[in-house]
Curated annotation (Swiss-Prot):
Organism of origin: African swine fever virus (isolate Pig/Kenya/KEN-50/1950) (ASFV)
Presence of the UniProt keyword Metal-binding in the record: no
Reported induction: Expressed in the late phase of the viral replicative cycle.
Protein's name according to its UniProt entry: Minor capsid protein p17
Subunit text: Interacts with the minor capsid protein M1249L and with the hexon capsid protein p72 capsomers; these interactions form a rigid zipper structure that stabilizes the capsomers. Interacts with host STING1.
GO terms classed as biological process: symbiont-mediated suppression of host innate immune response
Signal peptide annotation: none
Disordered, as annotated region: 97-117
Subcellular location: Virion membrane; Host endoplasmic reticulum membrane
GO cellular component: host cell endoplasmic reticulum membrane; membrane; virion membrane
Job description of the protein: Together with the penton and the other minor capsid proteins (M1249L, p49), forms a complicated network immediately below the outer capsid shell, stabilizing the whole capsid. Three copies of p17 encircle each p72 capsomer in the inner capsid shell, anchoring p72 capsomers on the inner membrane. Required for the assembly of the capsid and icosahedral morphogenesis. Additionally, inhibits the host cGAS-STING pathway through its interaction with STING1 and subsequent interference of the recruitment of downstream components TBK1 and IKBKE.
Residue intervals passing through the bilayer: 39-59
Coiled coil ranges: none
Residues annotated as glycosylated: N12, N61, N98
Length: 117
């Protein structure tokens, strides 16, 4: 579409160009009048971006490390030490005494009776 055939479009383009030129002019004018402040602000912005990138990398590495170390055994104090050494469940699994899975596991006395019979 030609800009001469549509006066609304040409007005819109000229307004955009005017805003763009005035913004560029304002920035150039500010940089020319205050070069020290502009350099300080740009330096701070660059440092913030670098810090943000470093924090993102460290956070990503930590989350990857946590996922890769999950299958390893936790420290020794994590599990509750009980007389039967073949049960290695964390504390929150031991709260319920009469669960359905515990009823199907025979005790040592029941196993001895079954072996003698």
């Amino acid at each position: 579409m030609d800009t001469e055939t549509s006066p609304l479009l040409s007005h819109n383009l000229s307004t955009r160009e005017g805003i763009k030129q005035s913004t560029q002019g304002f920035l150039a004018h500010t940089i020319a009048r205050h070069p020290g402040i502009t350099a300080i602000i740009l330096g701070i912005l660059i440092l913030l971006v670098i810090i943000l990138i470093v924090v993102a990398i460290v956070y990503y590495n930590r989350s990857v490390d946590c996922k890769s170390t999950m299958p390893k055994l936790p420290p020794p104090g994590y599990y509750v030490q009980q007389p039967e050494p073949h049960h290695h469940f964390p504390v929150f699994f031991r709260k319920r005494k009469n669960s359905t899975t515990q009823q199907h596991i025979p005790s040592d006395e029941q196993l001895a009776e079954l072996a003698h019979s």
